[in-house]
Amino acid sequence: MSQSNRELVVDFLSYKLSQKGYSWSQFTDVEENRTEAPEGTESEAETPSAINGNPSWHLADSPAVNGATGHSSSLDAREVIPMAAVKQALREAGDEFELRYRRAFSDLTSQLHITPGTAYQSFEQVLNELFRDGVNWGRIVAFFSFGGALCVESVDKEMQVLVSRIATWMATYLNDHLEPWIQENGGWDTFVELYGNNAAAESRKGQERFNRWFLTGMTLAGVVLLGSLFSRK
Protein backbone atom coordinates (compact mmCIF):
# COMPACT_ATOMS: atom_id res chain seq x y z
CA MET A 1 0.00 0.00 0.00
CA SER A 2 2.77 2.39 0.97
CA GLN A 3 4.64 1.68 -2.24
CA SER A 4 1.50 2.23 -4.33
CA ASN A 5 0.91 5.62 -2.75
CA ARG A 6 4.53 6.56 -3.29
CA GLU A 7 4.13 5.58 -6.93
CA LEU A 8 1.09 7.85 -7.28
CA VAL A 9 2.96 10.77 -5.72
CA VAL A 10 6.03 10.33 -7.91
CA ASP A 11 3.94 10.03 -11.07
CA PHE A 12 1.97 13.18 -10.29
CA LEU A 13 5.04 15.22 -9.40
CA SER A 14 6.87 13.96 -12.48
CA TYR A 15 3.93 15.02 -14.61
CA LYS A 16 3.79 18.49 -13.09
CA LEU A 17 7.52 18.99 -13.49
CA SER A 18 7.37 17.81 -17.10
CA GLN A 19 4.71 20.44 -17.83
CA LYS A 20 7.36 23.04 -16.98
CA GLY A 21 10.06 21.33 -19.02
CA TYR A 22 11.76 19.60 -16.08
CA SER A 23 12.65 15.92 -15.64
CA TRP A 24 11.98 14.05 -12.40
CA SER A 25 15.20 12.02 -12.61
CA GLN A 26 17.49 15.02 -12.63
CA PHE A 27 16.18 16.17 -9.26
CA THR A 28 16.07 12.81 -7.50
CA ASP A 29 19.73 12.37 -8.44
CA VAL A 30 20.50 15.62 -6.62
CA GLU A 31 19.22 14.22 -3.33
CA GLU A 32 20.73 10.76 -3.80
CA ASN A 33 24.18 12.15 -4.56
CA ARG A 34 24.07 14.66 -1.74
CA THR A 35 26.29 13.34 1.04
CA GLU A 36 26.63 16.42 3.20
CA ALA A 37 24.61 19.60 3.48
CA PRO A 38 26.51 22.83 2.92
CA GLU A 39 26.96 24.72 6.15
CA GLY A 40 24.05 26.97 6.98
CA THR A 41 21.56 25.46 4.52
CA GLU A 42 19.62 23.41 7.06
CA SER A 43 17.46 25.00 9.72
CA GLU A 44 16.94 23.59 13.16
CA ALA A 45 13.24 23.89 12.40
CA GLU A 46 13.59 21.03 9.92
CA THR A 47 14.23 17.97 12.01
CA PRO A 48 16.15 14.86 10.87
CA SER A 49 12.90 12.90 10.96
CA ALA A 50 11.36 15.30 8.45
CA ILE A 51 14.35 15.02 6.12
CA ASN A 52 14.24 11.24 6.24
CA GLY A 53 10.55 11.13 5.42
CA ASN A 54 9.25 10.35 8.90
CA PRO A 55 7.73 13.68 9.92
CA SER A 56 5.90 14.18 13.18
CA TRP A 57 2.55 15.62 12.11
CA HIS A 58 0.54 17.93 14.32
CA LEU A 59 -2.75 16.43 13.20
CA ALA A 60 -4.30 13.84 15.47
CA ASP A 61 -3.12 10.33 14.61
CA SER A 62 -5.62 8.22 12.75
CA PRO A 63 -6.75 5.00 14.47
CA ALA A 64 -6.13 3.05 11.26
CA VAL A 65 -2.67 3.66 9.86
CA ASN A 66 -2.27 2.94 6.15
CA GLY A 67 -5.90 1.79 5.99
CA ALA A 68 -4.89 -1.74 6.92
CA THR A 69 -7.45 -2.30 9.66
CA GLY A 70 -10.85 -3.62 8.71
CA HIS A 71 -10.65 -2.71 5.04
CA SER A 72 -9.50 -5.90 3.32
CA SER A 73 -12.47 -5.90 0.96
CA SER A 74 -11.74 -2.32 -0.08
CA LEU A 75 -8.11 -3.16 -0.64
CA ASP A 76 -9.06 -6.12 -2.79
CA ALA A 77 -11.46 -3.97 -4.79
CA ARG A 78 -8.80 -1.39 -5.39
CA GLU A 79 -6.62 -3.92 -7.17
CA VAL A 80 -9.29 -4.21 -9.87
CA ILE A 81 -8.52 -0.65 -10.99
CA PRO A 82 -5.24 -0.47 -12.93
CA MET A 83 -2.70 1.85 -11.37
CA ALA A 84 -2.42 3.62 -14.72
CA ALA A 85 -6.10 4.61 -14.50
CA VAL A 86 -5.61 6.11 -11.04
CA LYS A 87 -2.56 8.05 -12.21
CA GLN A 88 -4.39 9.39 -15.24
CA ALA A 89 -7.44 10.40 -13.20
CA LEU A 90 -5.21 12.25 -10.72
CA ARG A 91 -3.41 14.06 -13.53
CA GLU A 92 -6.67 15.15 -15.16
CA ALA A 93 -8.27 16.19 -11.88
CA GLY A 94 -5.14 18.12 -10.92
CA ASP A 95 -5.09 19.95 -14.25
CA GLU A 96 -8.75 20.89 -13.88
CA PHE A 97 -8.30 22.02 -10.29
CA GLU A 98 -5.34 24.21 -11.18
CA LEU A 99 -7.20 25.63 -14.17
CA ARG A 100 -10.03 26.77 -11.92
CA TYR A 101 -7.80 28.11 -9.15
CA ARG A 102 -4.67 29.13 -11.05
CA ARG A 103 -4.43 32.54 -9.41
CA ALA A 104 -4.87 31.14 -5.90
CA PHE A 105 -2.11 28.60 -6.43
CA SER A 106 0.19 31.19 -7.92
CA ASP A 107 -0.37 33.44 -4.91
CA LEU A 108 0.15 30.60 -2.45
CA THR A 109 3.47 29.33 -3.77
CA SER A 110 4.89 32.81 -4.28
CA GLN A 111 3.92 33.94 -0.78
CA LEU A 112 5.39 30.97 1.07
CA HIS A 113 8.98 32.11 0.39
CA ILE A 114 10.30 28.61 1.00
CA THR A 115 13.92 27.75 1.77
CA PRO A 116 15.50 24.32 2.37
CA GLY A 117 15.30 25.05 6.08
CA THR A 118 11.67 26.19 6.22
CA ALA A 119 10.01 24.14 3.46
CA TYR A 120 8.89 21.30 5.71
CA GLN A 121 7.29 23.61 8.26
CA SER A 122 5.39 25.47 5.55
CA PHE A 123 4.32 22.20 3.92
CA GLU A 124 3.03 20.81 7.20
CA GLN A 125 1.12 23.92 8.22
CA VAL A 126 -0.56 24.31 4.83
CA LEU A 127 -1.80 20.72 4.98
CA ASN A 128 -3.05 21.17 8.52
CA GLU A 129 -5.12 24.08 7.23
CA LEU A 130 -6.25 22.28 4.08
CA PHE A 131 -7.65 19.27 5.97
CA ARG A 132 -8.71 21.14 9.09
CA ASP A 133 -12.41 20.52 8.39
CA GLY A 134 -11.99 16.96 7.16
CA VAL A 135 -11.08 15.02 4.04
CA ASN A 136 -12.86 14.78 0.69
CA TRP A 137 -11.77 13.88 -2.81
CA GLY A 138 -11.50 17.51 -3.86
CA ARG A 139 -9.11 18.27 -1.02
CA ILE A 140 -7.04 15.22 -1.88
CA VAL A 141 -6.69 16.60 -5.41
CA ALA A 142 -5.71 19.95 -3.88
CA PHE A 143 -3.10 18.12 -1.79
CA PHE A 144 -1.48 16.63 -4.89
CA SER A 145 -1.68 19.93 -6.75
CA PHE A 146 -0.09 21.81 -3.87
CA GLY A 147 2.79 19.33 -3.77
CA GLY A 148 3.30 19.69 -7.50
CA ALA A 149 3.26 23.48 -7.30
CA LEU A 150 5.72 23.40 -4.41
CA CYS A 151 8.12 21.20 -6.41
CA VAL A 152 7.97 23.51 -9.42
CA GLU A 153 8.51 26.55 -7.21
CA SER A 154 11.50 24.85 -5.59
CA VAL A 155 13.12 24.12 -8.94
CA ASP A 156 12.40 27.62 -10.24
CA LYS A 157 14.21 29.00 -7.19
CA GLU A 158 17.16 26.61 -7.64
CA MET A 159 16.31 24.45 -4.62
CA GLN A 160 16.23 21.16 -6.52
CA VAL A 161 17.19 19.26 -3.39
CA LEU A 162 13.65 19.76 -2.07
CA VAL A 163 11.92 17.81 -4.84
CA SER A 164 12.58 14.30 -3.53
CA ARG A 165 11.95 15.46 0.03
CA ILE A 166 8.54 16.85 -0.90
CA ALA A 167 7.70 13.52 -2.54
CA THR A 168 8.61 11.69 0.67
CA TRP A 169 6.60 14.07 2.83
CA MET A 170 3.59 13.67 0.55
CA ALA A 171 3.79 9.86 0.52
CA THR A 172 4.10 9.77 4.31
CA TYR A 173 1.13 12.09 4.79
CA LEU A 174 -0.93 10.14 2.27
CA ASN A 175 -0.20 6.86 4.04
CA ASP A 176 -0.71 8.05 7.59
CA HIS A 177 -3.57 10.53 7.30
CA LEU A 178 -5.44 10.15 4.02
CA GLU A 179 -5.29 6.43 3.27
CA PRO A 180 -7.77 5.44 6.02
CA TRP A 181 -10.37 7.88 4.65
CA ILE A 182 -9.70 6.74 1.09
CA GLN A 183 -10.32 3.10 1.98
CA GLU A 184 -13.43 3.95 4.00
CA ASN A 185 -14.83 5.77 0.96
CA GLY A 186 -14.39 3.10 -1.68
CA GLY A 187 -10.67 3.30 -2.36
CA TRP A 188 -9.00 4.73 -5.43
CA ASP A 189 -11.43 2.80 -7.62
CA THR A 190 -14.17 5.18 -6.43
CA PHE A 191 -11.95 8.14 -7.26
CA VAL A 192 -11.48 6.82 -10.79
CA GLU A 193 -15.23 6.34 -11.17
CA LEU A 194 -15.83 9.94 -10.09
CA TYR A 195 -12.94 11.68 -11.80
CA GLY A 196 -11.69 9.30 -14.49
CA ASN A 197 -12.03 9.96 -18.22
CA ASN A 198 -11.57 13.67 -17.57
CA ALA A 199 -14.80 13.70 -15.56
CA ALA A 200 -13.70 16.77 -13.60
CA ALA A 201 -13.61 18.89 -16.74
CA GLU A 202 -16.79 17.34 -18.15
CA SER A 203 -18.63 18.07 -14.93
CA ARG A 204 -17.85 21.78 -15.05
CA LYS A 205 -21.42 22.44 -16.16
CA GLY A 206 -22.89 20.18 -13.50
CA GLN A 207 -23.94 22.26 -10.51
CA GLU A 208 -23.63 19.51 -7.90
CA ARG A 209 -20.06 18.58 -8.80
CA PHE A 210 -19.15 22.22 -9.31
CA ASN A 211 -20.24 22.95 -5.75
CA ARG A 212 -17.83 20.30 -4.49
CA TRP A 213 -14.97 21.94 -6.34
CA PHE A 214 -16.11 25.37 -5.17
CA LEU A 215 -16.00 24.29 -1.53
CA THR A 216 -12.48 23.02 -2.11
CA GLY A 217 -11.60 26.40 -3.56
CA MET A 218 -12.93 28.12 -0.48
CA THR A 219 -10.64 25.94 1.60
CA LEU A 220 -7.76 26.85 -0.67
CA ALA A 221 -8.53 30.52 -0.17
CA GLY A 222 -7.88 29.97 3.53
CA VAL A 223 -4.59 28.31 2.66
CA VAL A 224 -3.60 31.33 0.59
CA LEU A 225 -4.27 33.60 3.54
CA LEU A 226 -2.18 31.29 5.69
CA GLY A 227 0.62 31.52 3.17
CA SER A 228 0.48 35.29 3.43
CA LEU A 229 1.07 35.02 7.16
CA PHE A 230 4.06 32.71 6.60
CA SER A 231 5.67 35.26 4.30
CA ARG A 232 5.91 37.70 7.18
CA LYS A 233 7.84 35.35 9.44
UniProtKB/Swiss-Prot annotation:
Chain residue ranges for the region called Disordered: 29-71
Q: How is it modified after translation?
A: Proteolytically cleaved by caspases during apoptosis. The cleaved protein, lacking the BH4 motif, has pro-apoptotic activity.
List the ranges annotated as motif BH4: 4-24
GO CC, one annotated term: centrosome
Q: Where is this motif: BH1?
A: 129-148
* CDD domains tied to this protein: Bcl-2_like
Which Gene3D superfamilies does the annotation name?
A: Blc2-like (1.10.437.10)
Annotated SMART domains: BCL (SM00337), BH4 (SM00265)
Bilayer-crossing residues are 210-226
Q: Which UniProt keywords apply?
A: Apoptosis, Cytoplasm, Cytoplasmic vesicle, Cytoskeleton, Endocytosis, Membrane, Mitochondrion, Nucleus, Phosphoprotein, Synapse, Transmembrane, Transmembrane helix, Ubl conjugation
GO terms for molecular function, please?
channel activity
What GO terms describe the biological role, i.e. biological process, of this protein? endocytosis; extrinsic apoptotic signaling pathway in absence of ligand; intrinsic apoptotic signaling pathway in response to DNA damage; negative regulation of endoplasmic reticulum stress-induced intrinsic apoptotic signaling pathway; negative regulation of execution phase of apoptosis; positive regulation of apoptotic process; regulation of cytokinesis; release of cytochrome c from mitochondria
UniProt membrane topology term: Single-pass membrane protein
Q: Which domain of life is it from?
A: Eukaryota
Family annotation (InterPro entries)? Apop_reg_BclX, Bcl-2-like_sf, Bcl-2_BH1-3, Bcl-2_fam, Bcl2-like, Bcl2/BclX, Bcl2_BH1_motif_CS, Bcl2_BH2_motif_CS
Q: Where in the cell is it found?
A: Mitochondrion membrane; Nucleus membrane; Mitochondrion matrix; Cytoplasm, Cytoskeleton, Microtubule organizing center, Centrosome
Subunit structure as annotated in this protein's UniProt entry: Homodimer. Heterodimers with BAX, BAK or BCL2. Heterodimerization with BAX does not seem to be required for anti-apoptotic activity. Interacts with BCL2L11. Interacts with BAD. Interacts with SIVA1 isoform 1; the interaction inhibits the anti-apoptotic activity. Interacts with BECN1 and PGAM5. Interacts with IKZF3. Interacts with HEBP2. Interacts with BOP. Interacts with p53/TP53 and BBC3; interaction with BBC3 disrupts the interaction with p53/TP53. Interacts with DNM1L and CLTA; DNM1L and BCL2L1 may form a complex in synaptic vesicles that also contains clathrin and MFF.
Comment text on domains? The BH4 motif is required for anti-apoptotic activity. The BH1 and BH2 motifs are required for both heterodimerization with other Bcl-2 family members and for repression of cell death.
* Similarity comment: family membership: Belongs to the Bcl-2 family.
Q: What is this protein called?
A: Bcl-2-like protein 1
Q: Name the source organism.
A: Sus scrofa
This protein's gene is called: BCL2L1
